[in-house]
Swiss-Prot record:
ATP binds at residues 126-131, 148. Dually phosphorylated on Thr-276 and Tyr-278, which activates the enzyme. SMART domains: S_TKc (SM00220). The modification Phosphothreonine is found at residue 276. It comes from Caenorhabditis elegans. Residues 1-12 have a biased composition (Polar residues). Its cofactor is Mg(2+). Serine/threonine-protein kinase which responds to activation by environmental stress by phosphorylating a number of transcription factors such as daf-16, and thus regulates transcriptional activity. By phosphorylating daf-16, plays a role in daf-16 nuclear translocation in intestinal cells in response to environmental stresses such as heat and oxidative stresses. Downstream of jkk-1, may coordinate locomotion via type-D GABAergic motoneurons and regulates synaptic vesicle transport in conjunction with unc-16. This is Stress-activated protein kinase jnk-1. The gene is jnk-1.
Length: 463
């Protein structure tokens, strides 16, 4: 557990991570050449060859597809041989369902996809309980894309509401550090037949589950963190809290561009104080969420701090075995909070916390010792001490004392990248908060179908 994991090991730092939690992995099969920041001249010696930096080795065979049910499968691939009778890793066969004009049907593994004809050469790159993700070539845009099919989106109210949120929020946001929607469609033309939802997105090269296994220099660590903060600030500017930040929901390209995805659990700041604590994958769950205090925007700052620390350590910071153990893991390292924090807890929760063993905080110089950081190049303006200082401000149990996104962006460890166009990008279009009232599955189905119909009317989804 204490060692930095190799790319051939399993992922013991993520026990119990569910299939549903990690179905969004987007992993392209193409090779990676280099990580290039672009035209900024803030740092010297940043552009270098990193051909083997980002993507694990692959046989590259078209008839092999990796099942990405969890982060573990990235490092210990389970290969599923897919019938390649037609080439390209897919099996085309007559469909038992009606296939409308401009669509075609393909079977990928055990899943049937009915997609627009503009998307060719589908390959399975991710699968999970809530859906599958395929890469495809968009013959209209002349580029590779990712197509996500949501499995059983109307199985229950929770799935339906999450599907609506994901589709709606993706269509509203417009920021370089948030995954963009390129198209969305359903092959069903009538509401009473509507069951399948497809979302077309940008295809990325890896997620942070893989990047965590790499040895990163300060420039890459800093730039990845800067982009996470920019993307989250964009959501917060519209009053949207992501709530489910984790390495598998953050993806990167070979040029080091980072994007945040999966908005199925996103909530408005207004709602936050009425929300259940069971949001966010456990390891990245903020103390105020664990203790049922309600939360505000900087709940996402805690999650980003956990991810940042994981990038440095190479393993999960607080790998709790259950809800209670998660709190214990946090205070074992950061110490039991003071009385001003405890007084804000509900009486029953406060009584429980006060009766737990008390812990003294371990200094951040010990939690993140110098040998965990890359050596600082003579030409670099970034240091391990700066990174450690920022972590100490993000991983604060009391949310009232935790650093804000805006202040984190001004911190010396990330402000070398500061660009007002990126940081202060126009906020997303407003989200209709009235949609968050309780509704049944049929109502959510109708709302999603209307969204798809409106999208098709205002966009040329075919060509």
């Amino acid at each position: 557990m204490e060692e930095r994991l190799s790319t051939t090991s399993s992922y013991p730092s993520h026990p119990g991570r569910s299939v549903e939690e990690d179905h969004n992995t987007l992993l392209a099969s193409s090779s990676i050449s280099s990580i290039i920041r672009g035209t900024r001249g803030h740092l010297n010696n940043f552009i270098e060859s990193v051909g083997n930096w980002l993507v694990p080795s692959s046989s590259g065979r078209d008839d092999d597809a990796v099942s990405l049910d969890s982060c573990q499968s990235v490092y210990s691939p389970v290969r599923h041989h897919i019938n390649s009778g037609t080439g390209g890793g897919i099996l085309m066969e007559p469909s038992s369902i009606h296939v409308p004009e401009n669509y075609y049907s393909v079977t990928i593994g055990e899943a049937q996809m009915v997609v627009l004809k503009r998307y060719q050469n589908l390959r399975l790159i991710g699968s999970g309980a809530q859906g599958i993700v395929c890469s495809a070539f968009d013959t209209v845009r002349n580029e590779q894309v990712a197509i996500k099919k949501l499995s059983r989106p109307f199985q229950n109210v929770t799935h339906a509401k999450r599907a609506y949120r994901e589709l709606k929020l993706m269509s509203l946001v417009n920021h370089k550090n948030i995954i963009g929607i390129l198209n969305c469609f359903t092959p069903q033309k009538k509401l009473d037949e509507f069951n399948d939802l497809y979302i077309v997105m940008e295809l990325m090269d890896a997620n942070l589950c893989q990047v965590i296994q790499m040895d990163l220099d300060h420039e890459r660590l800093s730039y990845l963190l800067y982009q996470m903060l920019c993307g989250i600030r964009h959501l917060h500017s519209a009053g949207i809290i992501h709530r489910d930040l984790k390495p598998s929901n953050i993806v990167v390209r070979s040029d080091c561009t980072l994007k945040i995805l999966d908005f199925g659990l996103a909530r408005t700041a207004i709602e936050a104080f009425m929300m259940t604590p069971y949001v966010v994958t456990r390891y990245y769950r903020a103390p105020e969420v664990i203790l049922g205090m309600g939360y505000k925007e900087n709940v996402d700052v805690w999650s980003i701090g956990c991810i940042f620390g994981e990038l440095i350590r190479g393993r999960v910071l607080f790998p709790g075995g259950d809800h209670i153990d998660q709190w214990t893991r946090i205070i074992e390292q950061l110490g039991t909070p003071d009385r001003s924090f405890l007084e804000r807890l509900q009486p029953t929760v406060r009584n429980y916390v006060e009766n737990r063993p008390r812990y003294q905080a371990t200094p951040f110089e010990v939690l993140f010792s110098d040998n965990m950081f890359p050596m600082t190049a003579d030409s670099s303006r970034l240091t391990g001490a700066q990174a450690r200082d920022l972590l100490s401000r993000m991983l604060v149990i009391d949310p009232e004392r935790r650093i804000s996104v805006d202040d984190a962006l001004r911190h010396p460890y990330v402000n070398v990248w500061f660009d007002e166009i990126e940081v202060y990008a126009p906020p997303p279009l407003p989200y209709d908060h009235n949609m968050d009232v309780e509704q049944n599955v049929d109502s959510w189905r109708e709302h999603i179908f209307r969204e798809l119909t409106d999208y098709a009317r205002t966009h040329d989804i075919y060509s």
